[in-house]
Design a protein with these regions (language model features):
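Alpha-helical transmembrane segments of multi-pass membrane proteins
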Residues: 19-29
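Cytosolic juxtamembrane helix and N-cap/initiation of the first transmembrane helix
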Residues: 1-18, 125
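Core segments of alpha-helical transmembrane spans in multipass integral membrane proteins
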Residues: 17, 21, 42-64, 77-87
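Membrane-interface helix-boundary motifs at transmembrane edges
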Residues: 1-7, 64-72, 97-100, 128-129
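Membrane-water interface at the C-terminal end of transmembrane alpha helices
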Residues: 111-129
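Juxtamembrane "helix-exit" motif on the non-cytosolic side of transmembrane helices
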Residues: 27-35, 64, 90-98
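Membrane-helix boundary connector in multi-pass membrane proteins
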Residues: 68, 87-106
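Non-cytosolic membrane-interface motifs at loop->transmembrane helix junctions
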Residues: 35-44, 72-74, 98-109
Length: 129
């Protein structure tokens, strides 16, 4: 069994905090989000908030594990979620005409997701070595 490295633990904790924080924004401040979004569909915001909440809580569970093998699948799912979200953000910006405030938010999301993916991949490959 391989012990989880300190940086990986920090990244898992970061994923948890970020997941719960963004889940709170999407679940609680849905009306604020919808006020500038081009489509009136709260369900998509709730679905995103729910998935972020689940991933955030799973991060906290993973943080308290001590063996890499116990959290490897979770970590791979997080990396796939980041990658899929990056592709989705690109598609949204290309396909939908967004107000300027949302273009800025999508760019910010893109930067955060790239950061998440890069640091996650770094930890993943360091953990395997």
């Amino acid at each position: 069994m391989t012990e989880i490295k300190k940086l990986t633990k920090i990244v898992i904790l970061y994923y948890g905090i970020a997941g719960v924080l963004f889940a709170f924004i999407y679940l609680v401040f849905t009306n604020f989000q919808l006020s500038t979004w081009p489509y009136d569909d709260p369900v998509s915001f709730w679905s995103l908030g729910n998935s972020l909440l689940v991933l955030g809580i799973a991060s906290f569970f993973a943080y308290f594990k001590s063996e890499w093998e116990h959290i490897k699948l979770y970590f791979e799912i997080m990396l796939m979620w980041d990658f899929g979200s990056i592709l989705m953000d690109i598609a949204i910006v290309v396909v939908i005409t967004l107000p300027e405030v949302w273009v800025f938010q999508m760019i910010l999301n893109f930067v955060l997701l790239i950061f998440n993916l890069v640091i996650g991949l770094y930890c993943y490959f360091k953990q395997r070595s």
